Amino acid sequence: MSSSLWLQCMQRLQEELPATEFSMWVRPLQAELNDNTLTLFAPNRFVLDWVRDKYLNSINRLLQEYCGHDIPNLRFEVGSRPMAAPKPAPTRTPADVAAESSAPAQLQARKPVHKTWDDDAQAIADINHRSNVNPKHKFNNFVEGKSNQLGLAAARQVADNPGGAYNPLFLYGGTGLGKTHLLHAVGNAIVDNKPNAKVVYMHSERFVQDMVKALQNNAIEEFKRYYRSVDALLIDDIQFFANKERSQEEFFHTFNALLEGNQQIILTSDRYPKEISGVEDRLKSRFGWGLTVAIEPPELETRVAILMKKAEDHQIHLADEVAFFIAKRLRSNVRELEGALNRVIANANFTGRPITIDFVREALRDLLALQEKLVTIDNIQKTVAEYYKIKVADLLSKRRSRSVARPRQLAMALAKELTNHSLPEIGDAFGGRDHTTVLHACRKIEQLREESHDIKEDYSNLIRTLSS
């Protein structure tokens, strides 16, 4: 009963939730129904708290729908569903024993032995594992926001249960959004939990260079042993494998060996796996075997939080209105924000002047002028029209077909996000529409970005194009 009831609930939740959310939070849950109590087992405290906070009402609604007045009590626990007691083995007769002992040795197959995370990997004497994990990048100095929330949650779960949570974990998004920080944070957390763990971080080009050197020095077997003996392999910018057939071939076999051994793989890219050109389909397919999560450009609140955190790290007081002023004007990525703040702080140190909005405007005048020149409502309209292969006139027209209305709503939302224009000004620029129409468009796109992978991708792509 517990399995069928929870299976029904899961099927409905899968229909209602975005695929990434369902895979990350609901799929790992196990259920047991006992004495009219349905216990849901979560793999760790983080998942338990998240599910209880975000999905409790939905689960209770479905239980009431399926059970009516006999709705079971709902409990949450960290752990796994208790295993059923094994059935007693049948009594073996002397004839059975004799038959087994007389069977040919090759037919007495051994079960494959898989490496578990708690096993101590045998050290390879002739290979010195170079971690390359940056100790400065930790989870506690990664600023969380809606744009990176799922990626951060997945990274934490992998760090808590490497090889067993999501394998591989594939993070993708534009430059400077925090993917590399998360890779290092996972590596640091794994080593903190298990100091003798072999964790290797590298850029994909380093993998290629190592393989070329191994081939030149007739040391390809050592190369294979090195990469296949790690506990966690963290590879940045996997898209640089494009058109490198020999490297892809070797990585394909390394990937398979690590997964078979329950060794963790985390990959990052600037685009969704299937969109990486020049990479074999069999590799792209494997990239999606675990969990694939988008890291999006930070929204305004996250940009402000990043600036405040970085200023605190520099022991600099940054007024809220100053942080908001910078964050409102620099939108593309975290790296750009940090660079701008470093420039402001350096100017303040050189001149001894307090950091005010006027001072920031002066210190960043060329950067701000470039940004304002690049992102205008006119530019947004042209970019969106080109992206969706429609005319700018369509965006300004009264047409309501979805092929026009959705791009129009996206363009309005982008204008609100990327410019300093008011809602009435944006509405006026879109064929004289009312400000309430613009507000509705912004809210609709925000909702669709949560529900639709395609809309989320389109929005991120347009942000990157307009901010680059």
UniProtKB/Swiss-Prot annotation:
The keyword Nucleotide-binding applies. It comes from the Bacteria. GO terms for biological process: DNA replication initiation; regulation of DNA replication. Residues 84-131 are annotated as: Domain II. ATP binds at G176, G178, K179, T180. Residues 132-348 are annotated as: Domain III, AAA+ region. Keywords: ATP-binding, Cytoplasm, DNA replication, DNA-binding, Lipid-binding, Nucleotide-binding. GO terms for molecular function: ATP binding; ATP hydrolysis activity; DNA replication origin binding; lipid binding. It is found in: Cytoplasm. Oligomerizes as a right-handed, spiral filament on DNA at oriC. Domain I is involved in oligomerization and binding regulators, domain II is flexibile and of varying length in different bacteria, domain III forms the AAA+ region, while domain IV binds dsDNA. Belongs to the DnaA family. This is Chromosomal replication initiator protein DnaA. It comes from Vibrio vulnificus (strain YJ016). The lineage of its organism: Bacteria, Pseudomonadati, Pseudomonadota, Gammaproteobacteria, Vibrionales.
